[in-house]
Structures are given as C-alpha cells and as structure tokens.
C-alpha cells in the first residue's frame, strides 16, 4: 500500500521545466523527477525517480502535457529508494508495465528485505530535519525492479552512464551525460538546504550536500561529492532544488566536499 500524502510544499510544486537538451523536470512538492527522451527513439521516455507519495497524477499529467500524444514510458531509473523518490512508483507501474532499475546495493530497500536506518533529526538544524522521524523509511516491494547493468550503462539511454555515489544511501547513483556534461545528481548533491523548511518552501538556490537527516554515511557521501567534481559537470540537475547551469562546477563541488568532510 502506498504511503499517505505528506503536506510538504514548495513554491515550485507542480512546475515543469526544461532542464537540458532532451531532459525535462517536474517539481513534485519538495522533490524533482526527470523525464529523459531516448535520443534513438524520441517518443520513448525514461522517468528518473518517482516523486512523493500520492503524486502519480501530477507526474502522468506532466508527461501528457509535455510529450502530447504518442509517447511511451519505457523504464524508470531510481537514484535511490527513499520515500520522496519512489512515492508514486506503485501506481505508475499499474499504468505502465515497465522495468525499474536501481543499484544492486539498493535492492533490499525496494524488495521488502530491509528498512532504511532511522532519521537523524539532530544531524543539522532546521524544521524539516526535526520532522524527519515522521518520514517513511520502511521497505517497499517493487515487483519489476532489477539491478542496473554493472558496466555503468543506462538502459535505453546510450549517451548516459550511471555513477555509484553512495553515502546518502548504500546504493545511491547519479547519471552523467558526457557530451554536454549534464549531471543528474539525485540527492548526492542538492541545490537547496533541505533541512530548512523556509529554504525548501521558497526553493532558495544554494549548493548543499545530501539531506543530513537521512544520510547514512556522511564521510562516504562527502567522497561521492568529490567523485562528481571530477566529472566537471556544467549542469547540476538535482533531486531537490532548482537546477544550476552555465559554468563548470568542479571547484564548487570540491569546496563542498571539503566542507562536508570537515563538518559531517
């Protein structure tokens, strides 16, 4: 059974946006999902993450609005299995019988075998952090889920590769397209201080590490930020917050990684 609706909002909730060439985003309350067109078959759409609980209608309506008639959802790629990234997956799979891909180390959390660790409300100040023990962390069961290919390729998306970015969760991944240096980071890095309710509501744009209250291994998370810096991304499309584009973010990410190593 799906989790109940959670009354968490931002001013951008329901807003769709073009994030990069062939990549479109949708803010679902406080989290982003992304639609990627298959360059070899432009009517084929890959969904990255599945939003908040009870958000399936918002996601399907955006697909209809954005892609009009004739599109086909081919697969769902999950950056990880937290509730705000898998919230609509159950209903979406009732509408589309498609494969779901996730890192092999994340499989226990989406196959009924393991719950995520308890939230850490005191990891960082902020009202969202204080509320985090109320957020769902229980395992779910996705019948069609399977591990991503071990060679880093992304099904249906030959221009993209997946990068293991653990720390926030053991099997967290990010996606990278080398030709234009687009990084779809998931929660490995985000562009809003997710612990702060005020910043979440207004979507104050600022580079941050993953939400501290749900980050299991903080030092590994910092190392993952450093790994992403070495990709020299020029567009940061994140699981929370407004995308950042227009420059090489290597130095910004290295600075963030150093900060995280020192304070987490």
Predicted regions and their residues:
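Conserved beta-strand hairpin/beta-sheet module of binuclear metal-dependent hydrolase folds
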Residues: 12-66, 174-186, 190-191
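Short, structured coil segments at secondary-structure junctions
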Residues: 19, 95-96, 232
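Residue-level marker for buried hydrophobic side chains located in beta-strands
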Residues: 46-48, 77, 100, 182-184, ...
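Active-site HxH/HxHxD metal-binding segment of metal-dependent hydrolases
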Residues: 54-56, 64-146, 259
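C-terminal/domain-terminus segments
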Residues: 114, 119-132, 234-264
């Amino acid at each position: 059974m799906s989790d109940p609706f959670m009354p968490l909002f931002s001013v951008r909730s329901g807003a769709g946006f073009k994030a990069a060439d062939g990549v479109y985003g949708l803010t679902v309350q406080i989290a982003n999902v992304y639609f990627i067109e298959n360059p070899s078959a432009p009517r084929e759409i890959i969904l990255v993450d599945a939003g908040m609980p009870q958000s399936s209608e918002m996601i399907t309506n955006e697909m209809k609005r954005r892609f009009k008639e004739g599109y086909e959802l081919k697969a769902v790629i999950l950056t990880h299995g937290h509730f705000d990234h898998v919230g609509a997956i159950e209903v979406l799979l009732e509408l589309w019988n498609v494969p779901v891909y996730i890192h092999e180390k994340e499989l226990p959390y989406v196959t009924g075998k393991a719950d995520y660790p308890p939230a850490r409300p005191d990891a960082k100040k902020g009202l969202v952090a204080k509320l985090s023990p109320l957020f769902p962390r229980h395992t779910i069961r996705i019948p069609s889920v399977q591990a991503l290919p071990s060679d880093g390729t992304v099904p249906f998306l030959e221009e993209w590769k997946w990068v293991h970015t653990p720390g926030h969760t053991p099997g967290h991944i990010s996606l990278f397209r080398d030709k234009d240096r687009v990084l779809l980071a998931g929660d490995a890095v985000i562009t809003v201080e997710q612990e702060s309710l005020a910043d979440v509501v207004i979507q104050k744009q600022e580079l941050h590490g993953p939400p501290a209250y749900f980050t299991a291994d903080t030092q590994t998370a910092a190392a993952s930020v450093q790994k992403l810096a070495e990709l020299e991304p020029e567009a940061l499309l994140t699981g929370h917050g407004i995308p950042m584009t227009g420059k090489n973010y290597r130095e910004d990410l290295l600075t963030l990684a150093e900060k995280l190593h020192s304070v987490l």
